[in-house]
Amino acid sequence: GTIPAISRRQFIQAGSALAALPFVVKTGKVQAQGAAVSDTTPEEKVVQTCSTFDCGGKCDIRAHVSEGVVTRISTRPDNALDPQMPVMRACVRGRAYRKFVYHPDRLKYPMKRVGKRGEGKFERITWDEATTLIANQLKTITQKYGAASRYVHVGTAVSGGTFSGDKMVRRLLNLTGGYLESYHSVSMGNTAAATPYTYGTAASGSSLDTLLDTKLVILWGHNPTETIFGHSNHFYQKMKQNGTRFIVVDPRYSDTVSSLADQWIPLLPTTDNALMDAMMYVIVTENLHDRDFIQRYTLGFDEDTMPEGVPANESLMAYLSGAKDGVAKTPEWAEKITHVPAQTIRQLARDYATTKPAALIQGWGPQRHNCGERTARGSTLLATLTGNVGVKGGWAAGYGGCANRKFAAGPEMPDNPVKAKISVMNWVQAADDASQVTADVGLKDAEKLDSNIRILFSLAGNYLANQNPDLHQATRVLEDESKIEFIVASDLFMTPSARYADLLVPEPSSMERWNIGETWGTASYLILSEKLIEPEFERRSDYDWLREVAAKLGVEPAFSEGRDEKAWIEHIWEQTRLSMPDENLPDFATLQKTRQHLFKSAPFVAFEDNIRDPQNHPFPTPSGKIEIFSKRLYDMHHPEIPALSHYVPAHEGPEDALAKRFPLQLITWKGKNRANSTQYANPWLIEAQQQKLWINPQDAQKRGIAQGDTVRIHNARGICEIPAEVTPRIIPGVVAMQAGAWWQPDEQGIDKGGCANVLSSARITALAKGNSHQTMLVEVAKA
């Protein structure tokens, strides 16, 4: 049962050699094309599965299982690709999964904290002791503070599956009085909140098969080559082969730029709206805008199309011409702000406006700035001016979710008796001093909170500390045991967040449990994630031990409905079948053979009906039109929420006075070797992309920094020390590191792991009350 050690270099060499050979097996049998489960030897079976990490790919991982052990991982052979399915070839994360499953440092037993919270000192206890402790703490804390003192944190490591511990603990809490809910997605919550102010809905995306004849694609802060965002990269590569031109707007020369782009346009972070404003200025002053489209479908373009009750000079044309502030939004104006040459801005605007159709597709990185809502809406205004909304081959920009997406049903959730909701960004405040959580910072459905957070569940999540913006602010509250009285965490490893648990329990990997994987983006398919091997040591699924807790609280029959984990997956699948009779989903027994289901849908163009027949299909906005100017935003009277979504200098942006002290903008990217922080511990993947600070040669030279030097990245919130990567792939004035590295503080509190959240800000965005991880100013020096 032991797994022989193998280096990554040996792994790659072996893989390269095998790639040249036909797909053969020991017995001489060739695996049937497309077969999902096959017996290759009497001892070994090959099973199609997927991970349920916070990753949108849901790739075709082939687990080779022999005598209860995963011996290796492959992917679907190219000669067996299903023409009806997206290309599901497993990426480096999926191919390295076995090293994650069999890592010697995985948690093995339930443990109780014995040192100070955060020290990481624990002692082993039994499962009966663990579930009794949880049940007793729930009873005591609920009786003392009420159900609103109970909170469930983000469970990102299993968010790619339909069934997870964070969902089931919510079910348990709802059956026993409720809990304090949170809203907002830290991935895309800002754009999801902003896009409806233009279109009336966040679902502004089309299916990717409508783009195959698109002549120009602008990827704005989007990096699908590395992130594997729902397999869109395969569509883009096919489009490029067919002659589509790609322009990438990004401060960093990403792998997407190197593999797709005909042109790279770098800009200073947080200045996106200035670039967009200048593009719109060029488009309207050169009469490149789609006048008929604007006249028929929009509100707020000029003074003649403004809503009632708004004074003069608030329209888009008035803003661009400088009628109110005396500043015309010319490319020369934008060049000083963005550092994009004026002529490049002019050409980008002309290319976008005159190429029909064209698609401006935003990634979610730019909207994770404290100006992110404005950036998201700004892209929708550009799409509107050029008439690229509701047409095949165009793209409405903004959030980009697809309205025809279909999802599996989840476990049924009883009503929550606690009505108050907080933004996920408010949890530290709610734990520290609940009176500070008001409507101004995101409290919903209540005038005030009834209690501080006193008991917290963090199941399969590293957001408690590592992924939380302004990590030190969060850990100060976590370390104060008079605040949160009991923290339950489950994980595969002793992550930086797990160290703050009072009770820490070992979780199985996705190969040791049942689930259904769902894709992101527009790759609408479901894939079965079967329990392939038994968990070792005393690892148990969250649901399994939650049943014990439910029994000790007297609600087990209502909680489990008599189902084990596999029965829940079968139930969820059957509920999904019933909810989609037109899909003809197979029954569960058949699914266990076919392994996957691709949703049947014709090419889908967002807002096609609204454009084709606006009388019978008005936009779901107050005016029934595309709202270039939003009266709803105007009535908020907030300087950071302009009704037109134009450029406003960001807090900690390049124009902030703080830039004199901390002159470099730090951004992070999602890399190829992990999903957020998940798989950080995988030794193969650590080698695949080392944690370094990208710094431009000009900035490095000023600071006496050479390639490979350890550098100190610091601001008022924290200090981080990692090696420098001196490269022209990042523009001057900006530095970058990969997101998701584990926090590793030394005795002085200096992070040696490259965790950007020791430097990031917990400032919430003005409209969505969301996260702005990406907006931070730093200085860099040789350590």
Predicted features by range, described:
Residues 542-591, 678-679, 683-693, 698-783:
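Long, contiguous, secondary-structure-rich segments that constitute the structural scaffold
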Residues 131-150, 207-216, 326, 347-359, ...:
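Glycine-rich phosphate/diphosphate-binding loops that line cofactor/substrate pockets in enzymes
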Residues 181, 289-292, 345, 359-360, ...:
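Acidic/polar loop patches that form or flank catalytic/metal-binding clefts of enzymes
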Residues 1-288, 459, 701, 746-783:
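N-terminal export/assembly segments and adjacent metallocofactor-ligating motifs
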Residues 311-433:
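Active-site phosphate/pyrophosphate-binding segments
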Residues 1, 165-249, 273-274, 336, ...:
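Extended redox/cofactor-interaction regions of prokaryotic respiratory oxidoreductases
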